[in-house]
């Protein structure tokens, strides 16, 4: 979990730890990662498998890496950990190019030369690493409250079908969440735009956890 000490990363790490997964919280500061792991264990309220390491060491010790850093830190983070990647790993990009990256509004996104943050991530990591876009539209506020189910849907995009299946299984392990195969990685462009819309809805309706629900599909991945 790169950026696991931040709000979104903390929330996802908490939910997966509570679901029985072994979770490694990564941070530029190992001490901050250890502290976040300790807080996750306390918040879970029951024994969980969670630890904290530097980002580089976290990548070395896991098969699925989840990137939750702000968009402004995406490139630097991936370039720093690039030597630690191993063939066959899956990178899940949660970062969204909101306009706040350049001092603008959180209700808008900025253009990305690669097309989307997910595609940008794919252009940086080794070709032997499969990149997946997922969890971009899930409220950190909701994830961080273990007393509530995550009653929203997760759109999963990737050019690697096996990597999508791995991430869809991770979605299933979060109480209340449903995963949908949203096609190729280029569809990240649409998925990331939805995040800005949800932020706008949060502001308009004075809430913090607006989410997405897909209807009309009886079979969920």
Feature annotation, model-predicted:
Residues 1-42, 173:
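NAD(P)+-binding Rossmann beta1-loop-alpha1 motif at the extreme N-terminus of oxidoreductases
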Residues 43-51, 127-130, 177:
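A short helix-to-beta-strand connector/capping loop
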Residues 73, 95-98, 138-139, 160, ...:
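Glycine-rich beta-alpha junction loops
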Residues 104-114, 145-162:
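Short beta-strand and adjoining strand-loop segment in the mid-core
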Residues 110-136:
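Rossmann-fold dehydrogenase core element
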């Amino acid at each position: 979990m790169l950026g696991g000490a931040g709000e979104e990363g903390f929330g996802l790490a908490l939910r997966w730890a509570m679901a029985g997964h072994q979770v490694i919280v990564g941070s530029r500061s190992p001490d901050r990662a250890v502290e976040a792991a300790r807080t996750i264990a306390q918040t879970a309220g029951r024994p969980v498998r969670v630890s904290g390491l530097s980002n580089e060491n976290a990548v070395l010790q896991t098969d699925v890496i989840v990137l939750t850093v702000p968009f402004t830190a995406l490139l630097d983070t991936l370039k720093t950990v690039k030597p630690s990647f191993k063939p066959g790993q899956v990178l899940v990009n949660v970062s969204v190019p909101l306009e706040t990256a350049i001092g603008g509004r959180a209700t808008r996104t900025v253009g990305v030369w690669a097309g989307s943050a997910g595609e940008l991530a794919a252009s940086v990591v080794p070709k032997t690493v499969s990149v997946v876009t997922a969890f971009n539209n899930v409220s950190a506020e909701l994830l961080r409250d273990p007393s509530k189910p995550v009653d929203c849907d997760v759109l999963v995009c990737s050019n690697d079908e096996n990597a999508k299946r791995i991430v869809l299984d991770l979605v299933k392990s979060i109480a209340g969440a449903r995963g949908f195969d949203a096609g190729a990685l280029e569809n990240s462009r649409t998925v990331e735009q939805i995040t800005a819309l949800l932020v706008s809805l949060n502001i308009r309706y004075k809430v913090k956890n607006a989410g997405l629900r897909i209807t009309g599909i009886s079979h969920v991945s």
